[in-house]
Amino acid sequence: MKPPEHSLIIISGLSGSGKSVALKTFEDLDYYCSDNLPVELLPHFLRRRLRVAELSDQRIAIGIDIRSGSNISELDQWRHTAKHYNIKAHLLFFDASNETLLKRYADTRRRHPLSHLGLSLPEAIALERELTAPLREAAEAVIDTSTFNVHQLRRHVVTEFALTHSDKLSLLFESFAYKRGVPTEADFVFDARILPNPHWEPELRSLTGRDSNVRDYMEQQPDVILYLTQITEFLDTWLARLQADTRSYVTVAFGCTGGKHRSVYLAEQMARHAREKGWSEVATFHRELE
């Protein structure tokens, strides 16, 4: 029997740089996530987690920052534990410019974790940079989020880190609203505005394409069945060809008017179909629902 494959993502960085968004993204992709875990407890956490499901693959993402204790720069212990359990471990550091961090704190009106020291916000940011410098230096990747909005950051995490780069083709099925623009990174874009719109059904208007009532409505529409059948046949043919052409990942986007019902339903259905066909690296991203 093939031994289980485990992966561990350590997410660290500056407060306000997008660490929470990144961790939530991994959670949405079925990673087992924990935030602000004290560094000294990480080896015990890994041992316990792997014993719970020792026969299955484990994908774990853990957030560590200045709230995780005074030993955040001591990386040897968790690296040693990860290696001992044959875990592929990666450290990602999220950063942003001082100007960006100041603006984000002003917009959210949140307190900086170091504000209890009596520091001004610029002083707290400067001290945090100093305290987290060893983590930044040790990271496999430093992600500067200064120019990212939430949607762009989530997409970046999905395509660059959450979907593994291997000989397997990674698939991202995305939904969007045409009125907010077509995703520029999409490899295939399908227009669902021609399909019946659940928005005009009063009992469905407040729901999304993830809800069973909307799914039932869509599956009763002959045009929807035909649309899905033809797109499924197209993608089944060409995704296999793209993998043979050594592509790493493909983004398939579905658009409708509001990005809430039809496009979400189609993205979810195609992701489910892809998993049933044996594609192991599959994710969904619903831009207008985030």
From Swiss-Prot:
GO terms for molecular function: ATP binding; GTP binding. SUPFAM superfamilies: P-loop containing nucleoside triphosphate hydrolases (SSF52540). Belongs to the RapZ-like family. Keywords: ATP-binding, GTP-binding, Nucleotide-binding. It comes from the Bacteria. ATP binds at G13, L14, S15, G16, S17, G18, K19, S20. The lineage of its organism: Bacteria, Pseudomonadati, Pseudomonadota, Gammaproteobacteria, Lysobacterales. The keyword GTP-binding applies. This is Nucleotide-binding protein PD_0634. GTP binds at D65, I66, R67, S68.
